[in-house]
Amino acid sequence: RLALPPGAVCNGHKSDCQCFGAKYKCSCPFFWRFRKSAECHCKKGWAWTAIKKRSCHNRYQWSD
């Protein structure tokens, strides 16, 4: 499966590797686990997001 583009709905239970690019993470709203309608999205993270994502197995899919 290809990585999800920025703004796409992602699975908050999985790692940030599902989102495209080193700087993007799966961001979920506050108390998302308790709200049925809450969705997580791939959004730009902080500097340490890129550091944390260095070990992702699907890095070859990213261009940045």
UniProtKB/Swiss-Prot annotation:
Q: Which InterPro entries match?
A: Toxin_34 (IPR013605)
What keywords is this UniProt entry annotated with?
A: Disulfide bond, Ion channel impairing toxin, Neurotoxin, Potassium channel impairing toxin, Secreted, Toxin, Voltage-gated potassium channel impairing toxin
What top-level branch of life does the organism fall under?
Eukaryota
* Function recorded in the entry: Insecticidal to house crickets. It induces an excitatory slow-onset impact that leads to irreversible spastic paralysis. It also modifies human voltage-gated potassium channel Kv1.5/KCNA5. Most likely, it binds to the voltage-sensing domain of the channel, suggesting it does not block the pore but prevents its opening at physiological membrane potentials. The recombinant peptide binds to the channel in an irreversible manner and slows down the hKv1.5 current activation kinetics. It is not toxic to mice, when intracranially injected (at 0.5 ug/g mouse).
Q: Which cysteines are joined by disulfide bonds?
A: C10-C26, C17-C56, C19-C42, C28-C40
Protein name in the entry: Kappa-lycotoxin-Os1a
Single GO MF descriptor: potassium channel regulator activity
Single GO cellular component term: extracellular region
On whether Secreted is a keyword of this UniProt record, the answer is yes
